[in-house]
Amino acid sequence: MTTQKIVPTKSTDGSKLFRHQAKFVAGAMNINQILNFSLPEIAFVGKSNVGKSSLINTICNNKNLAKVSNTPGRTRQINFFNLADKLIIVDLPGYGFANVPISVKEQWGVLISYYLRNSYNLRLVNLLIDSRRGIKENDKKVADLLLANKREFQIIFTKSDKVTDHKNLHDEAQNFLATLNYSCNVMYVSNRSKEGARELKASLAKCIKPQK
């Protein structure tokens, strides 16, 4: 399997792209339901209740786009959202949630792993980490999977308004990346204060196809 490199766009800040309204286009509860949209895809992955759906709603300026719940494990399928026929935003089920049957956790694991390994159109993965919890073993396993499949990814610390010192997070991320021999963006975002939203949009806008 081959992947294509991120191609810079004319819009450097992403604001023009994200003025458009994103819409839900499909959900996949098993690998046979995963569709090929022939558009660049950017995925959000992380532990249950890390804030994936809320972050998607924040950058798309629509609090009702992706279903949000305070109960971990509510996203039980891969959800696909079309942004202006230029980009597919992918909300993956959370991992590491204990209060579901083992069979369900295994099903989610297979679904997440299959998508990350096999999506031809996947351009960038956003690995979301709860700022209050730091990088955990499951996060490291996902990063290993991404590297093994030559996937571009960046680290997004969510709920950054809940911590007062980002330096420890930065040091933790850099030490983690050093063990992987990998370099990438490290961002801090807050759905409440909107910190980091503009920078995140800019990084995602670089993934769309160049205008002809």
Curated annotation (Swiss-Prot):
NCBIfam families reported for this sequence: GTPase_YsxC
PANTHER family: ENGB-TYPE G DOMAIN-CONTAINING PROTEIN, MSS1/TRME-RELATED GTP-BINDING PROTEIN
Keyword Hydrolase: no
Ligand binding (Mg(2+)): 53, 75
Cofactor needs: Mg(2+)
Function, as annotated: Necessary for normal cell division and for the maintenance of normal septation.
Similarity comment: family membership: Belongs to the TRAFAC class TrmE-Era-EngA-EngB-Septin-like GTPase superfamily. EngB GTPase family.
Protein name (record): Probable GTP-binding protein EngB
Binding of GTP, residues: 46-53, 73-77, 91-94, 158-161, 189-191
The species this protein was found in: Rickettsia conorii (strain ATCC VR-613 / Malish 7)
Gene: engB
